[in-house]
Design a protein with these regions (language model features):
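Carbohydrate-interacting/catalytic domains
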Residues: 1-6, 17-25, 31-34, 38-206
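Catalytic and substrate-binding clefts that recognize carbohydrates or anionic sugar/phosphate headgroups
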Residues: 10-13
Length: 206
C-alpha cells in the first residue's frame, strides 16, 4: 500500500484516526504489510499474518498453507514481521500503537462537533473538534513538498493562542496577528490540543 512509503502511510493513518467516524485497521496494516498481486482476486490482500522470521512467517508449520505467506521482495516476512518491529521503537508497529493510544485520549473526535479551518492552501487540511469546553486541532499536508501557512484556530480569546503538540514537542504560539504560522513537511501532520493540557479540569464546566 502506497509503495511502502512510510511518510504517506503515517499520513493516511493519521488522517483516518482524526476524521469523523470509526477508524478501521485490518491485520497487518499496523506493520505496513504488503499484498501479493500474483494471487487471484481478493486473496492477494488476504495473505497470512507475518509474525516472525520463522518459516512461513511464524504463521503455520504446514508445508502447503492454503494461502502462501509473502516471502519475497520488500514485503517478505523476513523484512516485515511483528517480532522485529516490536523490538524497534521507531517501527511502524510501535508508531501505530502510539497513535492509537493518543486517539483514545482525544474524545473530542468521537463526541464533538467539527469545523474545517481556512489555511489558504488546498494541499493542507485543518480540522478542529470541540467538546465540553475543550478543543483539538489536526493538520495534514497532502503534498510531497513542505508547506508553510498561517491559520487561525477560530477560538476567541487567548486560549486559541497556544497549541500543544500531542505527538512531539513542536508546540505553536500565535503571532501578534492572532494567527499560527506552521511549516508542515511533505506528507506531514500535527495533532494539537488547543490551550493546554488542563482539559480534564474543564470538562465539568459545561
Amino acid at each position: 500500500m502506497l509503495g511502502g512509503d512510510r511518510r504517506r502511510l503515517e499520513l493516511a493513518y493519521s488522517l483516518m484516526f482524526t476524521l469523523p467516524g470509526t477508524p478501521v485497521l485490518r491485520y497487518g496494516d499496523e506493520l505496513g504489510m504488503g499484498d501479493d498481486l500474483s494471487l487471484k482476486e481478493r486473496t492477494c490482500c488476504r495473505t497470512p499474518m507475518q509474525w516472525s522470521t520463522e518459516p512461513n512467517g511464524g504463521f503455520t508449520k504446514s508445508d502447503k498453507p492454503v494461502v502462501p505467506v509473502i516471502s519475497d521482495g520488500p514485503y517478505g516476512y523476513e523484512h516485515v514481521n511483528a517480532a522485529e518491529q516490536r523490538r524497534d521503537p521507531n517501527s511502524m508497529l510501535n508508531w501505530t500503537e502510539r497513535i492509537i493510544r493518543m486517539r483514545k485520549e482525544v474524545p473530542e473526535v468521537g463526541w464533538g462537533e467539527f469545523e474545517i479551518l481556512k489555511t489558504g492552501d488546498a494541499a493542507v487540511l485543518a480540522i478542529r473538534y470541540d467538546w465540553r469546553n475543550n478543543s483539538v486541532l489536526f493538520l495534514h499536508n497532502f503534498a510531497k513538498d513542505p508547506r508553510e501557512f498561517e491559520f487561525s484556530t477560530g477560538i476567541e480569546g487567548k486560549i486559541g493562542d497556544r497549541l500543544v503538540n500531542l505527538l512531539t514537542a513542536d508546540h505553536s504560539t500565535a503571532g501578534e496577528n492572532g494567527k499560527h504560522c506552521v511549516c508542515l513537511e511533505g506528507y506531514g501532520y500535527r495533532w494539537y490540543r488547543v490551550g493546554g493540557l488542563d482539559y480534564l479540569l474543564k470538562r465539568t464546566e459545561f
